[in-house]
């Protein structure tokens, strides 16, 4: 999503070679240092993209992390944040694929229109939350903590989770 109430969905096939072709079309956007990337748990998205050789660059804004900075004692999932800040009930993932367990479906099992609606809503709600939480960070004088301390740790954690950490046991 690049504007509120407007989002796009590009299906990525399971076949890695075909998926890589699509990911490479968007590589310049992800690796553009001059554009902000917004996500809900953006670390997860960065790890997925890193698996395709994409290094996300530029300023980052994670709505989950922003809310953690503002109210660490509360839940930070998108469904909760949308209800609290936007007064909006999102499409819950378990409504589409079922509860965790052996009978849970994959997103690939769903009709494309269901995935489209879910993915576009996810992107749009995330951007709307960013716009609200950004103001809250400013109001609570938490911008420095968020932008200068918390967000710079995200790429570090991506690398640690992807590559591991060497430990000198001696």
Kindly give the residue locations of the regions a language model identified:
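Active-site-proximal helix-loop-helix substrate-binding element of RNase H-like nuclease domains
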Residues: 2-138, 149-153, 157, 162
């Amino acid at each position: 999503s690049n504007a509120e109430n407007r989002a796009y969905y590009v299906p990525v096939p399971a076949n890695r070679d075909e998926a890589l072709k699509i990911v490479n079309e968007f590589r310049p956007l992800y690796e553009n240092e001059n554009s902000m990337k917004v996500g809900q748990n953006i670390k997860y998205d960065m790890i997925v993209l890193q698996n395709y050789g994409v290094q996300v660059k530029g300023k980052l804004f994670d709505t989950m992390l922003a809310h953690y900075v503002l109210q660490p004692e509360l839940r930070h999932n998108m469904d909760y944040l949308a209800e609290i800040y936007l007064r909006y009930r999102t499409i819950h993932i378990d409504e589409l694929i079922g509860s965790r367990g052996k009978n849970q479906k994959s997103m690939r099992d769903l009709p494309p229109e269901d995935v489209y609606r879910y993915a576009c809503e996810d992107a749009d709600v995330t951007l709307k939350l960013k716009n609200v939480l950004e103001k809250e960070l400013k109001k609570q004088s938490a911008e420095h903590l968020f932008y200068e301390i918390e967000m710079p740790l995200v790429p570090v954690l991506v690398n640690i989770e992807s590559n591991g950490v060497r430990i000198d046991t001696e």
